[in-house]
């Protein structure tokens, strides 16, 4: 009897404009030569993120599936994750050797979380342009995600945000939970996220 190993499912959430899709593009391009990947994106009325990732060449088009949630995007990743679970299952059946599936949420507030049925690991993305106060506002995305990404560090001087203050507040809110600054334009911080996914997700084990 062959036991089919299920792919690791990593949920990527965060507010609109924080850089979720840019992070996914960077992760896919950096990890696709090592691991068998696929992506599920969520948008309310369109499949815009699916299109962006496909046109960017993040993965082959058939490995990127867009889900139109048709309503509150939080519901589709938490209370009723059936559409996303179906997309994950379809990708797993289509590509029998999948090792990692990213599930991108459709733009969240700070209280959004992924259903444990849908995501084995969760990454939450915020950005410096939202203001240095964001980490101290808390919410499950800030405090409970498995890895917190603070993106767009290059914008700090332009928006009057102190990275030192953000670091202090993040450490206070998250304790020992891992997190990192990123500038996806330059690739700063990307390898830390990849290492986290590979180690905590026990890829290849």
From Swiss-Prot:
Name of the protein in its database record: Urease accessory protein UreG
What family does the Swiss-Prot or TrEMBL record give for this protein?
A: Belongs to the SIMIBI class G3E GTPase family. UreG subfamily.
For whether the record's keyword set contains Chaperone, the answer is yes
Task: Name the predominant localization.
Answer: cytoplasm
Which keywords does this Swiss-Prot/TrEMBL entry list? Chaperone, Cytoplasm, GTP-binding, Nickel insertion, Nucleotide-binding
Q: Where in the cell is it found?
A: Cytoplasm
Quaternary structure annotation from Swiss-Prot or TrEMBL = Homodimer. UreD, UreF and UreG form a complex that acts as a GTP-hydrolysis-dependent molecular chaperone, activating the urease apoprotein by helping to assemble the nickel containing metallocenter of UreC. The UreE protein probably delivers the nickel.
Cited function: Facilitates the functional incorporation of the urease nickel metallocenter. This process requires GTP hydrolysis, probably effectuated by UreG.
Which GO terms fall under biological process for this protein? urea catabolic process
Q: Which Pfam families match?
A: cobW (PF02492)
Q: Which residues bind GTP?
A: 14-21
Cellular component GO terms held in the UniProt record:
cytoplasm
One GO MF term: GTP binding
